[in-house]
């Protein structure tokens, strides 16, 4: 009986616990508003890429960090449930797990989001180099800009060294050096990032 080889995806990226509160209206400065409900979910642009890849049937390898806290445990349970390869997921006790605090106005869906990067800001080139052996038989490498640019640049370098497609979601937008932009195979900005990188209002 023949078996189909899964597409292998490597994602160096961020992972967050998302705390979403719903309220009749968003508080003004100094105001306390009683919320109606709270949802604790999983997010981070890297984790979202991973979850989409795994659910599409890919053999998904994550390069990330989680803190030694309750949100880190929550993320690890999600990783296991989704079938993420966890060889390159590091536990980091120097800071908290990444977290997004999201306020949503129930009237119109408007929101405010505060992201605490936590251990995501520690994800660097050395984390990506630790996964170098798995780049050779990967089908694609995906990343985004919620981690240090050194990690993004190293992921691009390693992917290109073995002839693998490199995909960059340039979010959240920040100015990028020309040497990083040059040679990207797939560049996937949304409206905000497209305006930022082109200098043209969109």
Please provide the spans of the model-predicted regions:
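Ribokinase/PfkB-type carbohydrate-kinase core domain
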Residues: 2-15, 65, 73, 77-91, ...
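Glycine-rich phosphate-binding loop of ATP-grasp-fold ATP-dependent ligases
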Residues: 98-100
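Short, glycine-/polar-rich solvent-exposed loops and beta-turns at beta-strand/coil boundaries
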Residues: 93-95
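Glycine-rich phosphate/adenosyl-contacting loop at the front of the ribokinase-like
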Residues: 1-65, 70-81
